[in-house]
Amino acid sequence: MIPQDRHRTRCHAHLDARTCEGRDPWGLTVFGPDRLRETSVPLLDWLAGTGASKVAVHFDVDTVDSDEVVLGLGTVPGGLTRAQVHRVIDDLGQHSDVVGLTVAEFIPRDVLALQGMLRGLPLIGS
């Protein structure tokens, strides 16, 4: 089990600001998107303070600003841009050994819509 002070989460833009800054109900350190838009320094400073040298990144795609692209289950405006997410994860890799990367909640909406449209057509079937 990894101690709570060695976890970090990036908050969704739509969550209550009190939840997004400081600590969430589980005691995890959290950063809202506004703290990471311009720089990864707050996250890197926190990481340095933990003493951890290895990092596992769990990337929820709905943290990406839905005004730029909708990758997740719903639309969540105000998140980080794709470039900002890339920078944050790359910066983590420059300052630690990234040993894991998961991508979560990706919904291939276009593929699902196309499958539904084609279902039952000749040569496709059910």
Describe the role of every protein-language-model region.
Residues 1-6, 95-96:
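Active-site histidine-anchored catalytic micro-motif
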Residues 5-24:
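Low-complexity basic/metal-binding stretches
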Residues 20-126:
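Catalytic cores of soluble, metal-dependent hydrolases
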